[in-house]
Amino acid sequence: MWRASLWLVGGVLPSVEPMPQNTRVALKAEGLTKDFRGFRAVDKVDLEVLEGGVHALVGPNGAGKTTLFNLLTGFTKPSAGKITVFDDDVTGLQPDEITHLGVARSFQITSLFENLTPREHVELALQGRTKEGYRFWRSDRSLAKYHDRADELLADVGLGALADKPAGLLAYGQKRALEMALVSALDPRVMLLDEPTAGMGLEDVERTIELVRRIAVGRTVVFVDHNMHVVGSLANRVTVLQAGKVLAEGTYAEVRVDERVVTAYLGEAQDA
């Protein structure tokens, strides 16, 4: 459930990095639309994400956030509209083609090989970036050249000491951290994170906030999260979706007091 009341009322605003100035558009959607058998999940969405920015997409369940992510990364084909990545038109491209143009994403649900170690996961991801592509049944020797870089990426997400532990034995927060290491292994210019703190306790949430801050350096990040503390702590731009449409956009401070957002999400409670 989207905790809108925790976002829109009271509280001290967290500090975030300022919005990049004089930068180009890293990711852009124009009139992006998706229909599923008569149901419009995404409705003429216009979105601009600036290079180096951290941009949050928020809204209740069913607002179209994940569908929008799927459209931006090629997992779902749009019914109408255009998507560009640094001026390259990627509309309708396959996910791997978009990845090679510098866009990578995580998913809401963790999807790891339980018997592989974090190091093996990252080595395979690094291998997948090369012309060799993913070749799962290769000898350990063939992955050895990726060993040092894999360890660096694992250290970056706080998993250095767990590099040789089977992924199935990792705690939930550690699995999410491993997924971020896998996304980082693709060396993306634009990183999309779908609910990176979903299902986490308070301590894991705070660790994840710091982790995203680290991996965002030198990159453009777009993320979805229902936790408004996370949004306020990370995002220098926020887009609010409702029923597949853009309801409001601005800084966290601006959007949290936008009358359209207050009316949409707190109107009934305030009238009661």
Residue ranges of model-derived segments:
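Glycine-rich phosphate-binding loops of nucleotide-dependent enzymes
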Residues: 2, 8-272
